[in-house]
Curated annotation (Swiss-Prot):
<dbReference type="InterPro" id="IPR001810">
    <property type="entry name" value="F-box_dom"/>
</dbReference>
<dbReference type="Pfam" id="PF08268">
    <property type="entry name" value="FBA_3"/>
</dbReference>
<feature type="domain" description="F-box">
    <location>
        <begin position="21"/>
        <end position="71"/>
    </location>
</feature>
<dbReference type="InterPro" id="IPR013187">
    <property type="entry name" value="F-box-assoc_dom_typ3"/>
</dbReference>
<dbReference type="GO" id="GO:0009507">
    <property type="term" value="C:chloroplast"/>
</dbReference>
<dbReference type="Pfam" id="PF00646">
    <property type="entry name" value="F-box"/>
</dbReference>
<dbReference type="InterPro" id="IPR017451">
    <property type="entry name" value="F-box-assoc_interact_dom"/>
</dbReference>
<protein>
    <recommendedName>
        <fullName>F-box protein At2g40925</fullName>
    </recommendedName>
</protein>
<dbReference type="InterPro" id="IPR036047">
    <property type="entry name" value="F-box-like_dom_sf"/>
</dbReference>
Amino acid sequence: MQRERSMKRKRRRRGIKDMCNRHDCEIPPDLMIEILIRLPTKSFMRFKCVSKQWSPLISGRYFCNRLFTCVTRQQQQQPRLYMCLVAKDKQCVLLSSTSPDNTCFVLVDQDLSIPGYFFASVPGLLCFQFGTKACIYNPSTKQLLTLPSVKSDITAQQGQLKTTQYYIGRDPVNDQYKLVCTILIYSKLFANMSSEHWVFTLELGGSWKKVVPLGNYHPHAPATAGRSIDGVVHYLAWVDLYKCAVVSFNIRSEEVTTFLLPRKIWDVPVPALMMKADLIEYDGKLAIFSHSYLKDEGLVELWVLKDAAGKKKWSNMILVLQPCQRHLVHGIDLIVKGTTQDGKVILSPLEMRSQFYILCYDVQNNDLRKVEITGVPRLWLHKECNFDLKFMDESESFIYLEI
């Protein structure tokens, strides 16, 4: 009797499975995608476990692109602020929120709590560095991916230091995301420098591959965060204590180049540790935002790179803050945190305690605006910590991570 009941249950389960498979086959993949993209984004990771047919659909690049197009059309893109706080004891928290207006962000969501510090982003992904390893986080799907360490070919000798820096970029032609690793060995005052580069493609079976620099390459020490423009990651770097260069890594061709900045960009020789400048995107072009005189004189110098017929030329402009806005920067050491989607430069105080805020500088209209950040957990308000800030549109985070 018991054996007969067991056989009936097996036949019933087999019948249900066959029925589900028949129904799956009756639904075309295109129709399945149109159904899925109307469901909540945060549920996709659970839906991947429903059937073998759903998993590759949700993981596929076509689904991500289709979802992005659908959401962008249906809703107005709302910028989301991500704020990473790292205490001296290495405790790390990632907070985020949308803005109800243009004057305040209220941090309400704690997305992540891991050791590490985020340092770069592309639409849809945030990157953290944990020791010598890189972690990639998708805020929408809550996926966290840790990449293997790079097995460097260069070794620090006695008295030398070794640092590792990561950058992330996207190849818009092949729709590929890649992580770039710069490893530096140097002595005091940037003497005896040696650097190498590795690249990791974010795809199934990806691994670190060493990059062979081109002939005009200079060993260098990275000085700023990376800025990704049209499939190329750029950052400022020092080739010695007084010479600065722009380093460019083409995500598609995996070529790294360096070109020295002309002396005219700096009025006087500035040692590396005193430089107050960063790269930004200005009107679709790479630019240097120099704010050495901002806190004392309310003055910003902007150098825009124009590449005509293979020749790189710099044009510059000087911006002077409106008198009514000088108090926002007077006597305050600021640091550049990138740009918003509409081109505003994000500035934040070098140190923030008890009160968190950013400054949004509209370079086109020479207008500076203060945006407060509230809702930071009380235990962080008077704690000595490092922080970083990134803006990302909510409709950008539909990338499935897999290696």
